[in-house]
Amino acid sequence: MILCIGDVLSLAELQQILSLIADAEFVDGALTAGWNARLVKNNRQMPKGSLQQRKIEEIILAALERNLLFQMAARPKLIHSILISCYEAGMSYGTHTDDALMLDRHQLMRTDISFTLFLSAPEDYDGGELKIESSEGEQAYKLPAGALILYPASTLHRVEPVTRGIRYAAVSWVQSLIRDPQEREILFDLQTVRQQMFQESGKTRHFDLISKVYANLLRKWAEL
């Protein structure tokens, strides 16, 4: 499932992040890529553990925690440290798939889901689209600042060359409580339906039954 979520960050949060970025130093982004992805990664990245990176991560994690749509779709068990990337004119990230396992904070995690949180307005740069390959073909994404895209970490994807301006984005990975993507989507759909049912009719017999199905599937599939 690929899902775009708008307004993950408030305007105040976005402005605070951009202010922190303006004061930050960036290093070669290839340093954090896998051995093969390193060959096609040409961007800059905020050093992990720097003061600005830690403050930005705190803002983003708080925003993700309160975002119901993100929580429903991702079912996060672990979230990798947030990477803040910078693409200037001529920079890109060629076709690659993310590492299946990543070591973060001395803990090995499985990458089920990738996400990109756009920090630059689309009109501030040309190029820089995130392109994701799937069985339905290739799709390009260039979202408003503060919007986020969730997509399977198993996909081939790339960032097109930036030809003007600067593209800032926050990137990370989720180990989900629900490993199987089809099971995650089933739970997402059920949760969406039961919320709609409750809004329209309240706590009815039908709502109770679908809530039972939802809870029992979550109990069956969750990996703690």
UniProtKB/Swiss-Prot annotation:
UniProt-listed HAMAP family: Hydroxyl_YbiX
Protein residues bound to 2-oxoglutarate: 167
GO annotation, biological process: DNA damage response; intracellular iron ion homeostasis
Keywords assigned: Dioxygenase, Iron, Metal-binding, Oxidoreductase, Vitamin C
Ranges for domain Fe2OG dioxygenase: 78-176
Full protein name: PKHD-type hydroxylase CYB_2270
Membrane-spanning intervals of the chain: none
Co-factor remark: Binds 1 Fe(2+) ion per subunit.
UniProt xrefs under InterPro entries: Oxoglu/Fe-dep_dioxygenase_dom, PKHD_C, PKHD_hydroxylase, Pro_4_hyd_alph, Pro_4_hyd_alph_FE2OG_OXY
Enzyme Commission number, as recorded: 1.14.11.-
Cofactor: Fe(2+); L-ascorbate
Amino-acid positions noted as binding Fe cation in the UniProt annotation, renumbered to this chain: 96, 98, 157
Single GO term (MF): L-ascorbic acid binding
Disulfide bonds: none
Origin species: Synechococcus sp. (strain JA-2-3B'a(2-13)) (Cyanobacteria bacterium Yellowstone B-Prime)
